[in-house]
């Protein structure tokens, strides 16, 4: 689809990750679609999975947002249940309760007709808060009373937990793109991958059935 193509061209292309499958998630496609539909100026807003805020794979997403938007407001509501120990207790409640296990974030972004340097406004809601406490805080929040932190991203697309520049000088485990970079492993593989995940799920059983039938038909024509 054109949305998937745009994700590849503008977000996946800028990512330093080898496995870019997570960049084709629906919410990231929605970001890309919205920025394109805004045109020269406008506003977009989403409540989304927040893994893109600091995920290594999402560096291309952040670089794309930095490059194309003027003001970005990110309210990190935390709630990541895919953690353990004290980190899990810090993440605490998810605002979608049993309906969500990932970090939840609110993003509001402005694109101006005259390009200028992006300003990233970030707020972490805090540690050890229940879902009810988080929702109460959000209910009382306005742009004016939120204590925004201004983020100065680095050239690698890091917003939070920015990497040490010396990291780039370390040997890599492996590199398929260059023989000049010192690497520990010369040959390596991620194993067998179908790369057909997006065909295998949908909003209804009939939609999944239709997608799978199409996939099988097309596959047979190429045998």
Residue ranges and their predicted role:
Residues 5, 27, 58-62:
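Amphipathic alpha-helical segments in well-structured domains
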């Amino acid at each position: 689809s054109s949305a998937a193509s745009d994700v590849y061209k503008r977000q996946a292309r800028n990512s330093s990750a080898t496995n870019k499958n997570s960049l084709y998630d629906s919410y990231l496609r929605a970001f890309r679609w919205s920025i394109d539909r805004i045109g020269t100026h406008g506003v977009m807003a989403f409540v989304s999975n927040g893994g893109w805020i600091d995920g290594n794979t999402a560096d291309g997403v952040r670089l794309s947002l930095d490059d194309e938007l003027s003001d970005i407001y990110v309210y990190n509501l935390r709630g990541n249940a895919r953690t353990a120990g004290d980190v899990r207790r810090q993440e605490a409640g998810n605002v979608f309760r049993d309906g969500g296990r990932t970090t939840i974030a609110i993003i509001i972004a402005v694109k101006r007709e005259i390009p200028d340097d992006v300003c990233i406004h970030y707020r972490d809601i805090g540690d050890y808060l229940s879902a009810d406490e988080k929702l109460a805080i959000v209910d009382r929040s306005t742009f004016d009373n939120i204590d925004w932190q201004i983020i100065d991203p680095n050239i690698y697309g890091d917003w939070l937990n920015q990497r040490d520049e010396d990291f780039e000088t370390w040997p890599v485990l492996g590199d398929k793109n260059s023989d000049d970079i010192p690497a520990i492993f010369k040959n390596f593989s991620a194993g067998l991958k179908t790369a057909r995940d997006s065909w295998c799920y949908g909003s209804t059983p009939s939609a999944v059935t239709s997608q799978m039938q199409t996939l099988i038909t097309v596959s047979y024509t190429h045998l």
